[in-house]
Amino acid sequence: MMLSEETSAVRPQKQTRFNGAKLVWMLKGSPLTVTSAVIIVLMLLMMIFSPWLATHDPNAIDLTARLLPPSAAHWFGTDEVGRDLFSRVLVGSQQSILAGLVVVAIAGMIGSLLGCLSGVLGGRADAIIMRIMDIMLSIPSLVLTMALAAALGPSLFNAMLAIAIVRIPFYVRLARGQALVVRQYTYVQAAKTFGASRWHLINWHILRNSLPPLIVQASLDIGSAILMAATLGFIGLGAQQPSAEWGAMVANGRNYVLDQWWYCAFPGAAILLTAVGFNLFGDGIRDLLDPKAGGKQS
């Protein structure tokens, strides 16, 4: 009897690792999430194969075909210098969608690592990291992003860097909160007792158990990052001419919106469809992985 009590006292808690295959199986029961996933897959395929799907050279100027409406020759019409809008929207997906993916990758990796370090180290290091994050969060995201992009200079790379910097604090706070919980688990304490390094604890225990909320945050952030990159492109702080970026295309077409509606409509629709697809997918992932959000979790 005493032996069984001692054994149960030292038995480690069950590890709840992220299971990607189980997540895919759960997604099948959510039609809205499946629909958004189909939209995302189609947009990603468009991004990858856009050079071969484009019907014209996206940067070819033809002043004899300027501002033509949608037709069999130009499916989305043409812009003010005769460039084919269908080809530019397709090729522009490489910049707009890739910008969102790169931003989330940078912010997610740096923010998750800083958050886990802050939660594991504690003390002064934790206080310094979190005070810096609090200062960044106290400034409106759009204002801080525009200020950083203006300071770095107008280009797509600088715009992505500015957006990523602004998004880092969200991942830091999320990862730190998870680290504070996971580090109290019995198996983590046992690994620490047996001399496991902090990097081992972060990589093999804390970070892996923090994946579900981080994936939710990332899936929601991609749509926001695409919108933010388009916003910077619209105001001239993102991609520059003659590159085909959706936000810059909408900015160029705003002077023709009353008569040549197609100039703004098609790149704007691409931004809307992509952002909504990623946001709906993020909502579906959150409902499945976060029980506090009212989703299903088994």
Swiss-Prot record:
Induction of expression: Induced by RpoS in stationary phase.
Residues in ABC transmembrane type-1 domain copies: 97-282
Cellular compartment(s): Cell inner membrane
UniProt entry tagged with the keyword Ubl conjugation: no
Keywords (A to Z) from UniProt: Cell inner membrane, Cell membrane, Membrane, Peptide transport, Protein transport, Transmembrane, Transmembrane helix, Transport
Periplasmic-facing ranges: 55-96, 239-260
Disulfide-bonded cysteines: none
Gene Ontology CC annotation, any one: plasma membrane
GO BP, sorted A to Z: dipeptide transport; protein transport
Cross-referenced NCBIfam families: PRK09881.1
Functional description taken from the UniProt entry: Part of the ABC transporter complex DdpABCDF, which is probably involved in D,D-dipeptide transport. Probably responsible for the translocation of the substrate across the membrane.
Record's subunit section: The complex is composed of two ATP-binding proteins (DdpD and DdpF), two transmembrane proteins (DdpB and DdpC) and a solute-binding protein (DdpA).
Name of protein: Probable D,D-dipeptide transport system permease protein DdpC
Species this protein is from: Escherichia coli (strain K12)
